[in-house]
């Protein structure tokens, strides 16, 4: 029976999964949009949303708690100083997942995960990325 099992295994060990989620969270905070597989995006969403909810308080205890999760000082600074202020009035739902088809090699479902109200200059436009993939 699958009682009280919340997360996906993603076919990796637990330490690998935690490191992968932390690295993906740093990439998402830095670029505000990343392209990954759909199960990884679905696992990243609650992980990053709890970090943003904590970052809205912006005190020393929160800074240390977030730094213990993602281990990148510049990402923590952006999370607390920019994203925490940006989503101060939003009660949740800071990210969206956009399905983007299937990967060519193994037909894995691909998705973009991005922040709602994101800074477009931080990464790029999804439509431009899709047009570049079609050209290549």
Swiss-Prot record:
Keywords: Ribonucleoprotein, Ribosomal protein
Source organism superkingdom: Bacteria
Pfam families with a match to the protein in the record: Ribosomal_L17
GO MF: structural constituent of ribosome
GO biological process: translation
InterPro entries: Ribosomal_bL17 (IPR000456), Ribosomal_bL17_CS (IPR047859), Ribosomal_bL17_sf (IPR036373)
GO cellular component: cytosolic large ribosomal subunit
SUPFAM superfamilies, A to Z: Prokaryotic ribosomal protein L17 (SSF64263)
Complex and partners: Part of the 50S ribosomal subunit. Contacts protein L32.
NCBIfam families referenced in this protein's UniProt entry, alphabetically: L17
PANTHER family recorded: LARGE RIBOSOMAL SUBUNIT PROTEIN BL17M, RIBOSOMAL PROTEIN L17
HAMAP family per the UniProt record, alphabetical: Ribosomal_bL17
Protein family (similarity comment): Belongs to the bacterial ribosomal protein bL17 family.
Protein name: Large ribosomal subunit protein bL17
Organism whose genome encodes this protein: Rickettsia africae (strain ESF-5)
Organism phylogeny: Bacteria, Pseudomonadati, Pseudomonadota, Alphaproteobacteria, Rickettsiales
């Amino acid at each position: 029976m699958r009682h009280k099992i919340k997360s996906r295994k993603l076919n990796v060990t637990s330490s690998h999964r935690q490191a992968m989620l932390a690295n993906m969270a740093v990439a998402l905070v830095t670029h505000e949009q990343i392209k990954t597989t759909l199960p990884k995006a679905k696992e990243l969403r609650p992980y990053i949303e709890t970090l943003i909810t904590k970052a809205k308080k912006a005190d020393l205890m929160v800074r240390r708690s977030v730094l213990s999760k993602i281990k990148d000082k510049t990402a923590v600074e952006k999370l607390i100083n920019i994203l925490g202020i940006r989503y101060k009035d939003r009660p949740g739902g800071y990210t969206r997942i956009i399905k983007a088809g299937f990967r060519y090699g193994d037909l894995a479902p691909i998705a973009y995960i991005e922040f709602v109200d994101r800074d477009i200059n931080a990464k790029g436009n999804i439509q431009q990325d899709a047009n570049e993939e079609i050209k290549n």
